Curated annotation (Swiss-Prot):
PANTHER family: MITOCHONDRIAL OUTER MEMBRANE PROTEIN PORIN 1, VOLTAGE-DEPENDENT ANION-SELECTIVE CHANNEL
Domain comment in the entry: Consists mainly of membrane-spanning sided beta-sheets.
Protein's cellular compartments: Plastid outer membrane
Protein name: Outer plastidial membrane protein porin
Keyword Magnesium: no
Length: 276
């Protein structure tokens, strides 16, 4: 595995995972099974109010080729074919959705010790072309992410970022939405043994002069149980507890309250993931 600055999508990922991953207000159930031939089948269902959504995902691996096929309750078929290392540091990804004939996309990723590059293009007459790159090291890296609409003949996305890593600290600064949104994130691993960490995500929108922030923390009560909490500038406070009750099988309970409308009921989410 190549060690380097990673891809553009990796910038700020540690802070995002701490602040947003596993928080939900729905009821979700996931079960995975594995055959002796290496085929993995994952079935999941999510209850959103009175609406129930479900999907079945089948994953097949053959040497360095992985095929994922997912069918949802709307009879949509999503297929992703990933080829790992057709050349050193390269990953090729083909994805498409049936019945949408213009949903196909090809993506190439390249990881180097001092660079990470990703490029994708839609498989249609006038596709959107996306290109992102990160240049630097594990400690300091600079990145850019742009999209070009060949039909309109103009840039539809232009983002830039810088990422800094120092021991147990990770900081990132991003400029998104064509320079309108400035965001900064910070992640600090306080105690790796207990998985204790804090994170913050702050944003400023120049067009509206609006500021937002999310502050969160996590801590492992024991090797199998983790608790997390976060607050936002809008007054919403969330907490979750996640327990690995058997190897690779997780139960997660999360809640959210609006401190500015405390009379309202808290939102409760439950997630159960079963793996053999």
């Amino acid at each position: 595995m190549v060690k380097g600055p990673g891809l553009y999508t990796d910038i700020g990922k540690k802070a995002r995972d701490l602040l947003y991953k596993d928080y939900h207000s729905d009821k979700k159930f996931t079960i995975s099974t594995y055959s002796p031939t290496g085929v993995a089948i994952t079935s999941s269902g999510t209850k959103k109010g009175e609406l129930f959504l479900g999907d079945v995902n089948t994953q097949l691996k053959n040497k360095n080729i992985t095929t994922d096929i997912k069918v949802d309750t709307n009879s949509n078929l999503f297929t992703t074919i990933t080829v790992n290392e057709p050349a050193p540091g390269v990953k090729a990804i083909l994805s498409f959705k049936v019945p949408e004939q213009t949903s196909g996309k090809v993506e190439l990723q390249y990881l180097h010790e001092y660079a990470g590059i990703s490029s994708s293009v839609g498989l249609k007459a006038n596709p959107i072309v996306n290109f992102s790159s990160v240049i630097g090291t594990n400690a300091l890296a600079f990145g850019a992410d742009i999209s070009f609409d060949t039909k309109l003949g103009e840039l539809t996305k232009s983002n830039a970022a810088v990422n800094f890593v120092k021991d147990d600290l990770i900081g990132s600064l991003t400029l998104n939405e064509k320079g309108d949104l400035l965001s900064a994130s910070y992640y600090h691993a306080i105690n790796p043994l207990s998985n204790t960490a804090v994170g913050v995500d702050i944003s400023h929108r120049f067009s509206t002069k609006e500021n937002t922030f999310t502050l969160g923390t996590q801590h492992a009560l024991d090797p199998l149980t983790t608790v997390k909490g976060r607050v936002t500038n809008s007054g919403k406070a969330s907490a979750l507890i996640q327990h690995e009750w058997r190897p690779k099988s997780l139960i997660t309970i999360s809640s959210e309250v609006d401190t500015k409308a405390i009379e309202k009921s808290a939102k409760i989410g439950l997630s159960l993931a079963l793996k053999p």
